[in-house]
Amino acid sequence: MTSPSTSKNHRCLNLISKCKSLQNLKQIHAQIITIGLSHHTYPLSKLLHLSSTVCLSYALSILRQIPNPSVFLYNTLISSIVSNHNSTQTHLAFSLYDQILSSRSNFVRPNEFTYPSLFKASGFDAQWHRHGRALHAHVLKFLEPVNHDRFVQAALVGFYANCGKLREARSLFERIREPDLATWNTLLAAYANSEEIDSDEEVLLLFMRMQVRPNELSLVALIKSCANLGEFVRGVWAHVYVLKNNLTLNQFVGTSLIDLYSKCGCLSFARKVFDEMSQRDVSCYNAMIRGLAVHGFGQEGIELYKSLISQGLVPDSATFVVTISACSHSGLVDEGLQIFNSMKAVYGIEPKVEHYGCLVDLLGRSGRLEEAEECIKKMPVKPNATLWRSFLGSSQTHGDFERGEIALKHLLGLEFENSGNYVLLSNIYAGVNRWTDVEKTRELMKDHRVNKSPGISTLN
């Protein structure tokens, strides 16, 4: 199969990119066959690429009709499938890879251009993670070390990062002589989104080591970790860097800055960032409403929620969590109930346990404990520890011993190894002079082999 220069310049090839329907595509395909370009790699690769976006089954049929297709054509179709169909057609990408492996031609073998797309596909969903690990072994088997170029290495880093395997991702990253910006960003984002201990500290350390100029994605990871750590000064530095280097204050950078300033107690700075953003998505509104909620500005949070809707945006599941929470922190019970009821009735969003948790907190904080308890009994999902802990707090605040005891017993059932729950129960019993129950609680701790963490002081 050849690829002469004439095959690249024929006028019909310019029409391929303009095809918008399967009918147009078939007409161009017929013309390619008629003028004798059906055995040339370049026009076939363009045809495969576009047909995979218009009609994937037609693209696969084209490949089947090609006698002895080259690995370049296989790579083209694999890459296009992964780029245009995300996880929905991952099985087809791996099916094509299997065809490469089973080819009898000595010229059809996987190369350094085969694997990056497949590693990307492997990271889409947990069911494909084992395939990605197998691909790693194939890289070592089929590619010479000299062909382990930075694109393959970067794809490996991305795969393990997407799987949450930060140790493996970091080990592979350290072997890359000169990581490009995309690879740096991949690892930074993986650490920033991880719940592992010290992952945010790793983001700060990695950022200081960067050998390339950071962009907006780099700064989002840095600002997010600064927010989690309360690193206000470094977060402000990142904001200044964005402004001085004329980077875009897009939705991602803006949302991370709003979260940073809100968590550090600088709500006016957060609002200034929000107001200065030229484009705001639902996540931006959610971050700002969350900040207002935490600082007790529930009415302002509701106004922002209404503004979101008036702008033509559709609230998502997280929007209702932060907005009902804003109502809860400000005692706006009726408004919170109205917003909760609109979730399913207006927007078709089925409430989850976190929404019911906000509702229980809303009712409990206002002293409507009977309604909160009734809500727990009727909710269609199983209450979690966070919900029971909220109900416990409200019961203690309003002096309802019986409901507090119920909440704690449920907490013990969910977190029997948490010594704090036993201490709380013991304190409740001690507060009403039920010393026999205090002793029983301590015996229960011994039976479950739960040790109370000793108190410490940081004062010298």
UniProtKB/Swiss-Prot annotation:
One family name in Pfam for this protein: PPR
Region (Type E motif) location: 387-460
Cross-referenced InterPro entries: E_motif (IPR046848), Pentatricopeptide_rpt (IPR002885), PPR_At4g14850-like_plant (IPR046960), TPR-like_helical_dom_sf (IPR011990)
Domain of life: Eukaryota
GO biological process: RNA modification
GO-annotated molecular function: RNA binding
Keywords: Repeat
PPR repeat positions: 70-107, 111-142, 149-179, 180-214, 215-249, 250-280, 281-315, 316-351, 352-382
Keyword Transferase: no
NCBIfam families: PPR (TIGR00756)
Stated family: Belongs to the PPR family. PCMP-E subfamily.
This protein's name: Pentatricopeptide repeat-containing protein At5g43790
